[in-house]
Amino acid sequence: MKGKKRHILMVNLPYAGHTNPSLGLVRCLVAAGHEVDYIQAEAFRERVEASGARFVPYDEPPQSLVPALNEVRNWGAAYRTVRRIGANYDCLIYELLFFPGKALAAELGIPCYRLISTFALNRHLLRMLGQT
Protein backbone atom coordinates (compact mmCIF):
# COMPACT_ATOMS: atom_id res chain seq x y z
CA MET A 1 0.00 0.00 0.00
CA LYS A 2 1.64 3.16 -1.22
CA GLY A 3 1.90 5.94 1.32
CA LYS A 4 1.19 3.77 4.38
CA LYS A 5 3.54 4.48 7.25
CA ARG A 6 5.30 1.39 8.57
CA HIS A 7 6.74 0.36 11.91
CA ILE A 8 10.13 -1.12 11.03
CA LEU A 9 12.49 -3.16 13.19
CA MET A 10 16.19 -3.12 12.36
CA VAL A 11 18.77 -5.35 14.00
CA ASN A 12 22.52 -5.29 13.70
CA LEU A 13 25.58 -6.65 15.40
CA PRO A 14 27.96 -4.24 17.16
CA TYR A 15 30.41 -3.60 14.35
CA ALA A 16 30.89 -0.03 13.10
CA GLY A 17 31.56 -1.17 9.52
CA HIS A 18 28.17 -2.87 9.42
CA THR A 19 26.17 -0.41 11.51
CA ASN A 20 27.32 2.94 10.13
CA PRO A 21 26.26 2.23 6.51
CA SER A 22 22.76 1.30 7.69
CA LEU A 23 22.16 4.64 9.39
CA GLY A 24 21.65 6.48 6.09
CA LEU A 25 18.80 4.10 5.28
CA VAL A 26 17.34 4.74 8.73
CA ARG A 27 17.43 8.51 8.13
CA CYS A 28 15.62 8.05 4.80
CA LEU A 29 12.95 5.81 6.32
CA VAL A 30 12.34 8.25 9.18
CA ALA A 31 12.23 11.20 6.76
CA ALA A 32 9.58 9.32 4.78
CA GLY A 33 7.47 9.14 7.94
CA HIS A 34 8.16 5.56 9.00
CA GLU A 35 8.86 4.63 12.60
CA VAL A 36 12.14 2.73 12.99
CA ASP A 37 13.25 0.87 16.10
CA TYR A 38 16.89 -0.25 15.99
CA ILE A 39 18.20 -3.15 18.09
CA GLN A 40 21.88 -2.63 18.80
CA ALA A 41 24.52 -2.75 21.53
CA GLU A 42 24.68 0.12 24.01
CA ALA A 43 27.92 1.45 22.48
CA PHE A 44 25.91 2.49 19.38
CA ARG A 45 23.06 4.27 21.19
CA GLU A 46 24.16 7.81 20.27
CA ARG A 47 24.63 7.03 16.58
CA VAL A 48 21.32 5.17 16.32
CA GLU A 49 19.37 7.93 18.07
CA ALA A 50 21.06 10.60 15.90
CA SER A 51 19.71 8.78 12.83
CA GLY A 52 16.14 9.29 14.05
CA ALA A 53 15.50 5.71 15.12
CA ARG A 54 14.42 4.63 18.57
CA PHE A 55 17.29 2.75 20.20
CA VAL A 56 16.41 -0.71 21.57
CA PRO A 57 19.21 -2.32 23.61
CA TYR A 58 19.94 -6.01 23.40
CA ASP A 59 18.16 -8.18 25.96
CA GLU A 60 20.73 -9.31 28.51
CA PRO A 61 23.86 -7.87 26.87
CA PRO A 62 27.00 -9.95 27.47
CA GLN A 63 29.19 -8.98 30.42
CA SER A 64 32.28 -11.13 29.90
CA LEU A 65 35.77 -9.76 30.48
CA VAL A 66 36.82 -11.59 27.31
CA PRO A 67 35.95 -9.37 24.29
CA ALA A 68 35.76 -12.29 21.84
CA LEU A 69 33.26 -14.05 24.08
CA ASN A 70 31.12 -10.90 24.24
CA GLU A 71 31.05 -10.76 20.43
CA VAL A 72 29.69 -14.29 20.20
CA ARG A 73 27.15 -13.64 22.94
CA ASN A 74 25.94 -10.46 21.19
CA TRP A 75 24.46 -12.69 18.47
CA GLY A 76 22.34 -14.51 21.02
CA ALA A 77 21.30 -11.27 22.72
CA ALA A 78 20.23 -9.76 19.38
CA TYR A 79 18.32 -12.93 18.49
CA ARG A 80 16.44 -13.00 21.81
CA THR A 81 15.51 -9.33 21.49
CA VAL A 82 14.10 -9.75 17.97
CA ARG A 83 12.22 -12.86 19.01
CA ARG A 84 10.65 -11.07 21.98
CA ILE A 85 9.43 -7.93 20.17
CA GLY A 86 9.55 -8.71 16.44
CA ALA A 87 5.92 -9.68 15.91
CA ASN A 88 4.88 -6.10 16.71
CA TYR A 89 6.43 -4.75 13.48
CA ASP A 90 5.57 -4.52 9.80
CA CYS A 91 8.98 -5.84 8.72
CA LEU A 92 12.47 -6.77 9.87
CA ILE A 93 15.60 -5.31 8.31
CA TYR A 94 18.69 -7.22 9.33
CA GLU A 95 22.37 -7.04 8.49
CA LEU A 96 24.41 -9.53 6.52
CA LEU A 97 25.94 -11.24 9.56
CA PHE A 98 22.67 -11.73 11.44
CA PHE A 99 22.21 -15.17 9.89
CA PRO A 100 18.96 -16.15 11.67
CA GLY A 101 17.18 -13.04 10.33
CA LYS A 102 15.24 -14.72 7.51
CA ALA A 103 14.10 -17.71 9.57
CA LEU A 104 13.24 -15.50 12.52
CA ALA A 105 11.11 -13.17 10.37
CA ALA A 106 9.28 -16.20 8.93
CA GLU A 107 8.65 -17.50 12.45
CA LEU A 108 7.28 -14.07 13.45
CA GLY A 109 5.15 -13.83 10.31
CA ILE A 110 6.70 -10.59 9.02
CA PRO A 111 8.56 -9.81 5.79
CA CYS A 112 12.30 -9.20 5.98
CA TYR A 113 15.04 -7.43 4.07
CA ARG A 114 18.75 -8.17 4.35
CA LEU A 115 21.33 -5.38 4.17
CA ILE A 116 24.74 -6.09 2.74
CA SER A 117 27.23 -3.41 3.74
CA THR A 118 30.24 -5.24 2.31
CA PHE A 119 31.30 -4.16 -1.15
CA ALA A 120 33.80 -6.85 -2.18
CA LEU A 121 31.72 -9.96 -2.82
CA ASN A 122 32.05 -12.70 -5.40
CA ARG A 123 29.45 -15.06 -6.89
CA HIS A 124 30.37 -17.90 -4.56
CA LEU A 125 29.87 -15.79 -1.44
CA LEU A 126 26.63 -14.27 -2.74
CA ARG A 127 25.27 -17.76 -3.52
CA MET A 128 26.22 -18.95 -0.02
CA LEU A 129 24.60 -15.90 1.61
CA GLY A 130 21.45 -16.47 -0.43
CA GLN A 131 20.99 -19.79 1.34
CA THR A 132 20.86 -18.20 4.81
Go through each PLM region and give its residues:
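Glycosyltransferase specificity loop/lid
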Residues: 1-132
